[in-house]
């Protein structure tokens, strides 16, 4: 979220950014655009733009609980699964937990995602819900019960990928770098100025080792698809 001047007032402006891992396993920056706010209309326009530029074969979309993005993704990339970032989800649960209980609850939540497979994770989630209710953390228990499934999509992918596809930490690091570079400006004269500076920073990142180092072994995906075809 950046600030820009509009009719003499300083207002917030959102920049929507998308990165991806390509078919060879390397990270790419797909695009950036200005959005008045992170709603479905803004994300739909952005995803439509990316799809129009040739984005296809999307298998998994990772984000925080941005319903505008989740809904738009289902419309433009219906074949893709949605993975809710477990880090953001943990923080959401912690917001309903007393500070004295956060460490205990954190261990409970991490135990869910330490499961060896989807079945084990679901079974652990049931136990966590019971424990939270036993601690009278009703709201936290309800959040786990209603939303934990959104954090388990990564189990459908190779185990070697799990740690890197269940959070949107790679994007968060990029956004922090953009905020660091733009903070010195304060309020931009217009949205385009903010967009230009952010895009320049993204181009710089794309030219570093960030995009030259293989992030995922995508051969594992091909092996998984082949095994599935044989089983079917």
Model features per residue range: what roles?
Residues 1-7, 64, 83-86, 144, ...:
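Conserved, well-ordered core segments of regulatory domains
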Residues 1-62, 67, 71, 76-79, ...:
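RNase H-like nuclease fold core
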Residues 35, 104-108, 112, 116, ...:
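A short, charged helix-loop
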Residues 115-232:
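Acidic/histidine-rich catalytic cores and adjacent linkers
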């Amino acid at each position: 979220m950046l600030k820009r001047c509009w009719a003499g007032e300083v207002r917030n402006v959102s920049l929507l950014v998308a990165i991806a891992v390509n078919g060879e396993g390397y990270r790419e920056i797909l695009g950036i655009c200005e959005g008045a706010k992170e709603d479905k209309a803004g994300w739909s326009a952005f995803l439509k733009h990316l799809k129009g530029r040739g984005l296809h074969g999307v298998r998994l979309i990772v984000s925080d609980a941005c319903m505008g993005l989740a809904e738009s993704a289902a419309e433009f990339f219906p074949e893709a699964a949605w993975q809710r970032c477990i880090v953001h989800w943990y923080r959401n649960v912690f917001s309903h937990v007393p500070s004295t209980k956060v460490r205990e609850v954190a261990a409970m939540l991490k135990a869910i995602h330490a499961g060896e497979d989807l079945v084990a994770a679901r079974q652990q989630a049931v136990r966590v819900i019971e424990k939270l209710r036993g601690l009278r953390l009703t709201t936290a228990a309800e959040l786990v019960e209603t939303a934990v499934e959104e954090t388990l999509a990564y189990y459908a992918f190779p185990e070697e990928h799990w740690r890197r596809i269940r959070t949107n930490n790679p994007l968060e690091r990029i956004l922090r770098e953009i905020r660091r570079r733009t903070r010195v400006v304060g309020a931009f004269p217009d949205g385009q100025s903010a967009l230009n500076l952010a895009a320049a920073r993204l181009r710089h990142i794309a030219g570093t080792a960030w995009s030259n180092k293989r992030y995922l072994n995508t051969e594992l995906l091909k092996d998984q698809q082949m095994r599935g075809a044989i089983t079917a």
